[in-house]
Amino acid sequence: MLEVSILDKRWHSITKDPQSFVLNIINASLKELKIDHYKPNISIALADDNLLHQLNLKFREIDKPTNVLSFPCEQLSSECDLGDIAIAVDTIERESHEYCISILTHTAHMLVHGLLHLLGYDHQKEDEEIIMKSLESKILALLEFEKEKYGR
């Protein structure tokens, strides 16, 4: 089961139905990765910088907010508790302006990025980063978000 918690009302100004937007992105990603049949349990929190700052400090000892955090729980298996994803509206908005992309595109990217972390993908080493970015691009292209390139 996928559970979306909207913890900051500003998400409603980004998309009319934030819950459906998130569910569509995650479900399409699971399908593209050919793991939708596992029906994993994932909780997604649409939050703000304050919460992600607290979580980042507590779990990563980094004293600042970030765009997305993932907290893996179990290995992928049928109806497992795959983990939690939290996204900060403030950072997403700020980075969207910096990168000259839409907030929805950046949100979709961070949802896919967070999901891949739950599945064990990482980007600490160059070879891992190449694999993870390739999967992100493939999924975002399927969702028709890859057309809008990051202006970095």
UniProtKB/Swiss-Prot annotation:
Cofactors named for this entry: Zn(2+)
Residue positions binding Zn(2+): H113, H117, H123
Database matches in PROSITE patterns: UPF0054
InterPro entries given in the database record: MetalPrtase_cat_dom_sf_prd (IPR023091), YbeY (IPR002036), YbeY_CS (IPR020549)
Co-factor binding comment: Binds 1 zinc ion.
EC number(s) from the headed UniProt entry: 3.1.-.-
GO cellular component, one term: cytoplasm
Segment forming the signal sequence: none
Entry GO MF terms: metalloendopeptidase activity; RNA endonuclease activity; zinc ion binding
Keyword terms, alphabetized: Cytoplasm, Endonuclease, Hydrolase, Metal-binding, Nuclease, Ribosome biogenesis, rRNA processing, Zinc
Primary residence: cytoplasm
Subcellular location: Cytoplasm
Alphabetical GO biological process terms: rRNA processing
Family label: Belongs to the endoribonuclease YbeY family.
Function as written in the Swiss-Prot or TrEMBL entry: Single strand-specific metallo-endoribonuclease involved in late-stage 70S ribosome quality control and in maturation of the 3' terminus of the 16S rRNA.
Protein name, as recorded: Endoribonuclease YbeY
Lineage: Bacteria, Pseudomonadati, Pseudomonadota, Alphaproteobacteria, Rickettsiales
Annotated gene: ybeY
